[in-house]
Amino acid sequence: MDPDFLALRRVLLVDDCAPVRASIKGMLQQIGFKLIYQAKDAVEAISICEQHALDFILCDFNLGDCQDGYQLFETLKSRQLLHSMCCFVIISAESQRQIVHGVIELQPDDYILKPFTFPVLKERMVKVMKEKMALRKIFQASQGGDLAEACRQADVIIRQQNEVQLQAERLKGELLLQAGNYQQAETYYQQLVNQRKPVWSKLGLAISILQQQRFDEAEQLLTELTEHDETAVESRDYLAHLYFRRGNLKRAFEILQYVTQLSPKNIPRQKTMANLALLCHDFAAAARIFHKIVGLARHSMHDSAQNYLNHARCIIDNANQQAPIDRANALGHVGKLLDSLVKRFSPELIAFDLQILQVRLLCAKGKPAEAKQLLAKYQQLTEQEYHPETCLDAAKAYFETGDIFGCYFYVTQLRKQLNKANFLTDSQRLLLDTEQRRYEALYQQLKQLIQQATDAYQQQEYGKAVLIFSRASKEMPTNPALALSLLQAMTKCTGVSADTLPVARNALSLLQSAPLEQRMQERFKQYQQILSKQYSQLQNTQRG
């Protein structure tokens, strides 16, 4: 390669070991590079990338205790700090399957195992740069958003039948899939498979068939591809999505469990798996996954308060299914988790999330009246766009406190956001649909119970009315009108069951703290006086 060309290329070397950096820098100088930048960690590397348009990045996988090479590459791609012609090569002494699969998934330009010699480094770097130069028009058009032009440039190279023909063929297939031209992609990939091209051609064929919803054919191809190291992760990802789209959520979850063992650093996949656990009503598994995400995302571009909040939300969901003692222990853990959260992230930036979480925490502790009071104090049904998980949690909080309007407000807000076409968004959309169906079913059930209780009261079957109003109040413990109806029916009875008394106590607490219209306030005082004489067990509540 022309020495003058190499002398003008900007190279960044990222390694946490100073002697290793010095050794590799010497090799780079021997190759002919003169503009060599060095970074000992990801923070320095990102800073250099922000200041300079680099042509080549040589990055160690293990960068110490902070962000590693995988996370750095992910960050640079996400922030668009790598221009279309920049070559990114990972170097590592690690050959573990987890690391190799993770690197394959991110698709750097090359991966070099340590230790390596000067001739090996030179050969690999020159090869990567030549390929990048030969394919530059494809990359430039693609990065500019002109997929059709990128395909045309790929065809030009394919017709030339030179040393980068295979790479151009692969890029063309990926461009067809990216553009959503699935029938054309299927025809193209089938031709490549018939020509015995590498295994990626068969994966492209499977994806194009899957996107046309021919699930049986796609399943067969994807299952075969799981046997190849190169496609072990991606084929299983698509296989899990296939089962998800078929409605087999348990099988999709099992496949993602295996994939996350192969390549654990992919945070969107971990979140998708947690969502599948929630859809399978395995709240304990979802909590474990979100706990794992908190650790895995640390130092990465995915590190956020939402990871901690999602963990806390899952603990509350799981606690609602547990026995009282286990529930108390679990909810105590939520408090500790929130303490850790506010030490790392500004409480002001997540004030609404924390408020909603406190409301749900009070509901889970059996204090719905306090929860409703807290929500009313900070209520803000605004068009502000919150994180998807925040909207779903807000919908749950409003439903649990009996505010159907507030619940559906956040359901609508969330639905507007779920417009991407990927596995994670699909799982979020199904979670929302499932929650909405649950709300609608409970709401219809409550309407029926209230009607049955009202009919019983009008027919002077007061004992029956109390039982049904009590059942309805357990489902909607923060509805003042329902609480008042229960107390009214109780004034007509000579006695109620032991199961009804806790519900009645909650009704009294709710009505004592809730802002009531004058007519409702007068009725409440009237019922209080009657009940204090009839039921001595309620007197402490009334004085409180």
Label each PLM-derived region with a short phrase.
Residues 183-411, 424-431, 441-459, 486-495, ...:
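Flexible loop/N-cap segments at domain edges
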Residues 70-71, 84, 94-110:
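Alpha4 helix (beta4-alpha4-beta5 surface) of REC/receiver domains from two-component response regulators
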Residues 121-132, 137:
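Receiver (REC) domain switch/output surface
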Residues 59-76, 84, 393, 496, ...:
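Conserved phosphotransfer microenvironments
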Residues 7-19, 24-28:
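Conserved acidic segment of CheY-like receiver
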Residues 38-56, 64, 183:
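Acidic, metal-coordinating helix/loop segments flanking the phosphotransfer/catalytic sites
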Residues 114:
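A Lys-centered signature of the CheY-like receiver
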